[in-house]
């Protein structure tokens, strides 16, 4: 059975002028994921559950595990020396790594260290999301915010780790999507799903229907469409919503479906972060034959203007995302 490390080295030839930095960078993320996996599994036995009492730049109270995962991933990436700096959902500003090696590094990493962390207390799946870009500024100097404010189409690699009944790392470098399952007895990620593709059709929709009254008119119409009886299109669809983007996306990737987090009356710009959540998942979706949109525009075409920018998010089976876009276009809010 092929391990993640073996697979990454084998695929290194996909990159022109590859010299091993990206391979080492992905290995650092793999190490961070293994550490987080270990500690999530005993979270109820040590004091890393619950809130930290600290708020992030968006005014949201951070969970203890959010901060813990952020520090572990940051340390793993810094130790490898292949990263010039990071941006994280848990950090107010970019983190610039110091030292000559970091200044000469080609890549920057953006991450959501622990997506869905509020689910930890009740033992529901959570995940880590990461996104890798080649820096814009010249090597040899510290990175700037400009290196992180790139459209998603410029991503070199992206992926996530889902910590569930098993721990899985799923990633793409622009040559398909591959998934690796963690074997705790050996301490390695083993290739379990190669060239993952969204099914051509799906019958699941994932959305927090508790916010229905706040949704745009087109989204309400689409939800009703999902719930209507129609044998020709195999409706009604099944509603499945975990409340963890990674877990919901992962299920829909394997089974077929759409994940929706639209703009609402209370969050007119959307709730999910463009850089840390939408872009990496959009890259994965497109590489797996799916689609990702803000309801009108391709997610990967959006040029961000700030680190913690938000966006409405529609991602999943291509035909389902296109149906949702059609309902939004045909039913504008007055």
Swiss-Prot record:
Mg(2+) 2 binds at residues 112, 115, 277. It holds the Pfam family FBPase. InterPro entries: FBPase_C_dom, FBPase_class-1, FBPase_N, FBPtase, Fructose_bisphosphatase_AS. It is found in: Cytoplasm. Gene3D superfamilies: 3.40.190.80, Fructose-1,6-Bisphosphatase, subunit A, domain 1. Mg(2+) 1 binds at residues 89, 112, 114. One of its GO terms (cellular component) is cytosol. Keywords: Carbohydrate metabolism, Cytoplasm, Hydrolase, Magnesium, Metal-binding. Substrate binds at residues 115-118, 208, 241, 271. It is an enzyme of class 3 (hydrolase). Its EC number is 3.1.3.11. GO terms for biological process: fructose 1,6-bisphosphate metabolic process; fructose 6-phosphate metabolic process; fructose metabolic process; gluconeogenesis; sucrose biosynthetic process. One of its GO terms (molecular function) is magnesium ion binding. PROSITE patterns: FBPASE. It catalyses: beta-D-fructose 1,6-bisphosphate + H2O = beta-D-fructose 6-phosphate + phosphate. Its cofactor is Mg(2+). Binds 2 magnesium ions per subunit. Pathway: Carbohydrate biosynthesis; gluconeogenesis. Homotetramer. Belongs to the FBPase class 1 family. This is Fructose-1,6-bisphosphatase class 1. It comes from Serratia proteamaculans (strain 568).
């Amino acid at each position: 059975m092929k391990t993640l490390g073996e697979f990454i080295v084998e695929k290194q030839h996909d990159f022109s002028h590859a010299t091993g930095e990206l391979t080492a960078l992905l290995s650092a993320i793999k190490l961070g994921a293994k550490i987080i996996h270990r500690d999530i599994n005993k979270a109820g036995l040590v004091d890393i559950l619950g809130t930290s009492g600290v708020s992030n730049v968006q005014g949201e109270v951070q969970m203890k595990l959010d901060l813990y995962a952020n520090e572990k991933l940051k340390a793993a990436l810094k130790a490898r020396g292949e990263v010039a700096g990071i941006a994280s959902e848990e950090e107010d500003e970019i983190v610039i790594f110091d030292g000559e090696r970091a200044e000469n590094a080609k890549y920057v990493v953006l991450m959501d260290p622990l997506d869905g962390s509020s689910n930890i207390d009740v033992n529901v799946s959570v995940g880590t999301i990461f996104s890798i870009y080649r820096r814009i500024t010249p090597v040899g100097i510290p990175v700037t915010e400009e290196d992180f404010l790139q459209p998603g189409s410029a991503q070199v690699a992206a992926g996530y780790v889902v910590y569930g009944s098993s721990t899985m790392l799923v990633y793409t470098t622009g040559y398909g999507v591959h998934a690796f399952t963690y074997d705790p007895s050996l301490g390695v990620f083993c290739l379990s799903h190669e060239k993952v593709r969204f099914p051509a059709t799906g019958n699941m929709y994932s959305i927090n229907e508790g916010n229905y009254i706040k949704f745009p008119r087109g989204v309400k119409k689409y939800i009703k469409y999902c719930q209507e009886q129609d044998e020709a299109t195999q409706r009604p669809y099944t509603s499945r919503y975990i409340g963890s983007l990674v877990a919901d996306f992962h299920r829909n990737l394997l089974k077929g479906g759409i994940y929706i987090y639209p703009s609402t009356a209370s969050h007119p710009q959307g709730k999910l972060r463009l850089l840390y959540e939408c872009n990496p998942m959009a890259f994965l979706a497109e590489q797996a034959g799916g689609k990702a949109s803000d309801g009108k525009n391709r997610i990967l075409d959006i040029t961000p203007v700030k680190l913690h920018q938000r966006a409405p998010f529609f991602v999943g089976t291509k035909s389902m995302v296109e149906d949702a876009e059609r309902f939004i276009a045909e039913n504008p809010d007055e």
